[in-house]
Amino acid sequence: MDAQLLQANKRLLRRAANVRQRYKMLATESFVADIKQILLRFIQKPNVIIMYISVLVLFAAHIDSNTHDILDDLAAQFPNNTFIEWAKSNFFRICGALVFIPVIIDTEEKHRNYLALVIFVFLMGFPQRSIMEYFIYSISFHVYAKAKHPVTRIFIIGAAVFSCVMFGIFTNEQLRKLYAELPKVPTHPVAVNRVEKVANRASRVSTEGTVNFG
């Protein structure tokens, strides 16, 4: 029985590797295949699965009214600890940070600090979001960092903006104000002078023509 189970696991791993390789070959031809091979490789990693399961367990313990989660226990043991009090009031930020950890670990070392800084600003600069939103944003960050097809990054940026509007991070009124505050593109002075000269010349011709015909 153990030998059969081992063989079955090997077949599944071999099949998954073949699928990932096929998507990797197609990544340069299709941005959909690019996204598929990135997600397939990412989700198969044990540290990613363990971290996501840990976040789900932490969230389940938090929403269970009959169970005190670990933050409640720590707050009872250390009532004057400001960090624990902050963590209790920022529970979803903590979960979001845990969700983003696999993304930071999986990125290239030369980009790791930069990505960690961007994620820190995102977590602390915006109001707390739901765990599902943090999961979507973490996947978006990962796909953007690993993309090989040029259209993939454009698609991720568009999807991220759409998600921010849909989840209420940016409202339509805020987007309109942002658009209104964008600097206007200045017109080149030479072009302005040429336009003014043409307009003045046309005005003089029109005036002279009117006088002559009068």
From Swiss-Prot:
Segments traversing the membrane: 43-63, 84-104, 116-136, 150-170
Family matches, as InterPro entries: SP24
Membrane-protein topology: Multi-pass membrane protein
Localization terms from the record: Host membrane
Keywords: Host membrane, Membrane, Transmembrane, Transmembrane helix
GO annotations of cellular component type: host cell membrane; membrane
Protein name: Uncharacterized protein p24
Natural source organism: Citrus leprosis virus C (isolate Citrus sinesis/Brazil/Cordeiropolis/2003) (CiLV-C)
Organism phylogeny: Viruses, Riboviria, Orthornavirae, Kitrinoviricota, Alsuviricetes
